[in-house]
Regions:
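NAD(P)+-binding Rossmann beta1-loop-alpha1 motif at the extreme N-terminus of oxidoreductases
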Residues: 1-68, 74-75, 82, 89, ...
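Active-site-proximal catalytic alpha-helix in oxidoreductases
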Residues: 190-217, 223-236
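Helix-loop-beta segment of a Rossmann-like dinucleotide-binding subdomain
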Residues: 111-114, 143-156, 208-220, 269-277
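NAD(P)-dependent Rossmann-like dehydrogenase/reductase catalytic/cofactor-binding core
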Residues: 2-8, 74-81, 225-329
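Short alpha-helical
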Residues: 42-46, 98, 127-128, 164
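Rossmann-fold dinucleotide-binding core
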Residues: 123-196, 202
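Rossmann-like NAD(P)(H) cofactor-binding subdomain of soluble oxidoreductases
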Residues: 65-144
Length: 329
């Protein structure tokens, strides 16, 4: 990728996060023509014909027209104008479901391999999601931001190759109004990921197992609050032993602060509950299974999370069996 050539970015997953990400990358940044395309599935026809209408709190309502729109990964992989260009950034924003699909193998047709090949950017929940990509694309730059829709956007490198791709992303986001975008070390990024589990690994599964209880109501219920606090505390005590670094009280809210904040957040439902109610697979492995397995590799137990994982995994299995007696998860 020369300094004068267009930069080709492909977003795999045209949901809310993917479309927002795309809209903030597409355009001319510091003289570079960044062309962002989308791989859509169920919404392909609508986006191909009409583009994307975004409604945001920080940036208002606006319209975004992608450079190209594809109905499948295969179609996007075939489209490189006869090999005239590569996908410089392959950005994955789909749900991470390693028990169902291998994301690295799925995106393989899109990736130009090697140090100077495609940079793989993983905007997905959970921990351990990068391992299959490291195994498949050992020389490619791999980045795993925290949530783009949070108050700040940390972008960090998860491979041993150059970090120029990440610095480019940070500069493009900053130029387009995301002022808190910043580069982070792999260790700092992993720490942020583990801290996010305090919410995702405690409240999401507990909401499903308690019959669809919203986060705020769980935080106000004395028994559930005790349970949630214990789950968060388990992460707070285990993660530093795995990462070798303590949480920073200035950057990472304590369980007490998280629960206090949750009391006031009465809107919305946890994503795992929405998936459960819609009959979709839940992100059990990356939010619960992977942390438990990573801890075990270091000789550590996470009994609270393991209990949630065991119960919810069986509940999902039973639900699938009831819907289709031949289904096996």
């Amino acid at each position: 990728m020369s300094d004068s050539a267009p930069v080709h970015v492909l977003i795999v997953g045209a949901g809310a996060v993917g479309c927002f990400y795309a809209s903030k990358l597409h355009g001319i940044h510091s003289g570079r023509d960044v062309r962002v395309s989308l791989v859509c599935r169920s919404n392909y026809k609508a986006i191909a014909e009409n583009g994307v209408q975004l409604e945001t709190h920080s940036f208002g309502n606006y319209h975004f027209t992608p450079y190209r729109v594809f109905s499948s990964i295969k179609q996007a992989g075939d489209y490189t104008e006869g090999g005239a260009f590569q996908w410089d950034y392959v950005v994955v924003t789909t749900k991470a479901l390693p028990d169902i699909t291998n994301d690295a193998l799925d995106i393989a047709p899109l990736v130009t391999r090697g140090v100077d090949g495609s940079c793989i950017v993983l905007i997905q929940n959970g921990v351990g999601i990068e391992e299959v990509h490291r195994a498949e694309f050992g020389q490619n730059p791999i980045a795993k931001p925290n949530s783009l829709l949070s108050d700040s956007t940390l972008l960090g490198q998860l491979s041993s190759v150059t970090d120029k791709h990440i610095h480019q992303l940070v500069s493009w986001f900053t130029a387009n109004g995301i002022r808190d975008a910043e580069f982070a070390s792999e260790l700092s990024l992993q720490q942020t990921r583990w801290h996010k589990l305090c919410i995702n690994a405690s409240m999401n599964p507990s909401s499903v197992l308690s019959g669809g209880t919203p986060n705020a109501r769980m935080a106000l219920d004395s028994e559930l609050r005790t349970h949630l606090h214990a789950c968060m505390n388990e992460i707070f005590t285990t993660a530093p032993k795995i990462l070798g670094i303590e949480f920073d009280a200035k950057k990472h809210a304590s369980p007490d602060r998280i629960l206090k904040s949750t009391e006031r957040n009465t809107g919305g439902k946890p994503s795992m509950l929405l998936d459960w109610q819609a009959g979709r697979p839940m992100e059990l492995e990356v939010i619960l299974g992977n942390p438990i397995r990573i801890a075990r590799r270091d000789g550590l137990d996470m009994p609270r999370l393991q209990t949630l994982y065991a119960l919810l995994k069986m509940a999902q299995t039973r639900k699938a069996e009831e819907a289709n007696p031949t289904a096996k998860l």
